[in-house]
């Protein structure tokens, strides 16, 4: 169990003891364990975050502009303030390091700007921050690498925000008795407002630029740093807990992730620092660059983006390949797949039948979606050439296909909590052409 020695103090559930909050805040048992700290199931998912009980505040350091010779105003409009990291997202990971994604289609949004400008979230003294002020903060500190910042916000909420159990509309009806007449439509919008408000609040508390500067780690065209120097500086400002850093192919710092457990509902904003569950980082031990915003390579290009790759997908251990529907066969012709770098990280996978998805209910692989908007984002380990999903690179099937050309087996993603008992376990090897 995570932090078992600490979490013993939180074990047990005594529902008679309640917090007393003002209207609009959760009223939950005071002695619930931290998220991912329970030893028995907890049914009240308005008070206990599950399955995404590990909350990551992820931040970008985007330094390369789209074109040279931008002035400071133009540079900050594109990349954010020169003396600040920007927000990538607030992600709920499961307790073993995997992560759910695009959980509830009925909660998906296609707009943030209009929602935060609406009367429902302005001119209301009971709100911690007015919607238009929050929107201004997002425009300043939550930047997309493609220039369409709102598209990143929408993506982050649909992919991650809809997976937060304590932000579901049915929870709001419990915490807001005086506004219960507003109903599910209002609560759906309130969850969007709260997701971005809480993300921004946590980002402000974790000022990575200042944390590094306190330890004389500042952006430079020439100076380089060791991984231990950067991690030590962050740890000393993050309650002695480690952060996770990532670099691009030039070994330049690009991201910092902060892991947390959650005490109660996310609406309480009681985040407890946690050491990273993932250790894989592209940053080398030595020679890490921390370039100032506006820096460009001598050939005037920003960091390389991987081109679209084309190839087949082979099954490790048992032999065979994937066909265009995403099923496993042993005889015949393997399908061609495209591995496409997503706008916001990770990869899309596409056959001529359509984009591949992993259905959340059974984690079954299917490649027939016509739209890329909500296609699954896959992990790709370039060194090993294997495909993964939600932090796991293991796949499986209940049965193996026979040698006939019509025999096909359904493929499932495997995680510590799903499909771990499948008879056949393997990896999906992407063979580039």
UniProtKB/Swiss-Prot annotation:
A Pfam short name: Ribonuclease_T2
Disulfide-bonded cysteines: 28-47, 36-95, 46-171, 103-163, 247-283
GO CC, alphabetical: cytosol; extracellular region; fungal-type vacuole; vacuolar lumen
Keyword set, alphabetical order: Cytoplasm, Disulfide bond, Endonuclease, Glycoprotein, Hydrolase, Lyase, Nuclease, Signal, Vacuole
Annotated localization: Vacuole lumen; Cytoplasm
Positions of glycan attachment: 38, 71, 221, 263
Catalytic activity: a ribonucleotidyl-ribonucleotide-RNA + H2O = a 3'-end 3'-phospho-ribonucleotide-RNA + a 5'-end dephospho-ribonucleoside-RNA + H(+)
GO MF term set: ribonuclease T2 activity; RNA binding
GO terms (BP aspect): apoptotic process; cell morphogenesis; mRNA catabolic process
EC category: lyase
Protein EC: 4.6.1.19
Keyword DNA-binding applies: no
Active site: 88, 156, 160
Entries under InterPro entries matching the protein: Ribonuclease_T2_eukaryotic (IPR033697), RNase_T2-like (IPR001568), RNase_T2-like_sf (IPR036430), RNase_T2_His_AS_1 (IPR018188), RNase_T2_His_AS_2 (IPR033130)
Entry superkingdom: Eukaryota
Entry similarity comment: Belongs to the RNase T2 family.
Function: Rnase which modulates cell survival under stress conditions. Released from the vacuole to the cytoplasm during stress to promote tRNA and rRNA cleavage and to activate separately a downstream pathway that promotes cell death. Involved in cell size, vacuolar morphology and growth at high temperatures and high salt concentration.
PANTHER family from the UniProt entry: RIBONUCLEASE T2
Identification of the protein by name: Ribonuclease T2-like
Organism, scientific name: Candida glabrata (strain ATCC 2001 / BCRC 20586 / JCM 3761 / NBRC 0622 / NRRL Y-65 / CBS 138) (Yeast)
């Amino acid at each position: 169990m995570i932090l078992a020695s600490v979490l013993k103090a939180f074990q047990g559930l005594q529902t008679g003891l309640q917090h007393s909050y003002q209207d609009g805040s959760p009223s939950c048992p005071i002695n619930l364990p931290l998220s991912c700290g329970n030893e028995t199931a907890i049914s009240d998912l308005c008070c206990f975050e599950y399955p995404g009980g590990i909350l990551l505040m992820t931040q970008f350091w985007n330094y390369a502009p789209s074109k040279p010779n931008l002035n400071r105003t133009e540079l900050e409009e594109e990349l954010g303030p020169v003396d600040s990291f920007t927000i990538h997202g607030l992600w709920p990971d499961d307790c073993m390091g995997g992560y759910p994604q695009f959980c509830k289609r009925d909660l998906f949004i296609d707009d943030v700007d209009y929602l935060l400008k609406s009367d429902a979230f302005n001119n209301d003294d009971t709100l911690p921050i007015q919607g238009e002020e929050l929107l201004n903060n997002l425009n300043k500190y939550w930047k997309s690498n493609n220039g369409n910042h709102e598209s990143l916000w929408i993506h982050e909420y649909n992919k991650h925000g809809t997976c937060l159990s304590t932000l579901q509309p049915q929870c709001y009806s419990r915490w807001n008795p005086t506004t219960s007449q507003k109903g599910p439509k209002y609560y759906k919008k309130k969850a969007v407002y709260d997701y971005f408000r809480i993300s921004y609040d946590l980002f402000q508390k974790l000022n990575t630029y200042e944390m590094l500067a306190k330890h004389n780690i500042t952006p430079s065209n020439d100076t380089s740093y060791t991984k231990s120097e950067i991690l030590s500086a962050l740890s000393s400002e993050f309650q002695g807990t480690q952060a996770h850093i990532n670099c691009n192919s030039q070994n330049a710092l690009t991201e910092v992730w902060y892991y947390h457990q959650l005490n109660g509902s996310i609406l309480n904003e009681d985040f407890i620092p946690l050491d990273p569950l993932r250790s894989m980082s592209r940053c080398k031990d030595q020679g890490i660059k921390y370039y100032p915003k506006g820096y460009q390579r001598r050939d005037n290009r920003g960091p390389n983006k991987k081109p679209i790759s084309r190839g087949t997908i082979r099954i490790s251990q048992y032999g065979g390949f994937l066909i265009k529907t995403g099923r496993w066969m042993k005889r015949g012709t393997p399908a061609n797949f495209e591995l496409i770098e997503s706008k916001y990280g990770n990869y899309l996978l596409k056959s001529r039948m359509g984009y591949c998805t992993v259905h959340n209910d059974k984690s079954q692989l299917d490649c027939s979606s016509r739209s890329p908007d909500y296609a699954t984002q896959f992990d790709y380990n370039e060194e090993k050439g294997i495909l993964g999903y939600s932090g796991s690179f293991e796949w499986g099937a209940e049965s193996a296909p026979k040698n006939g050309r019509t025999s096909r087996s359904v493929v499932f993603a495997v995680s510590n909590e799903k499909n771990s008992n499948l008879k056949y376990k393997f990896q999906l090897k992407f063979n580039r052409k």
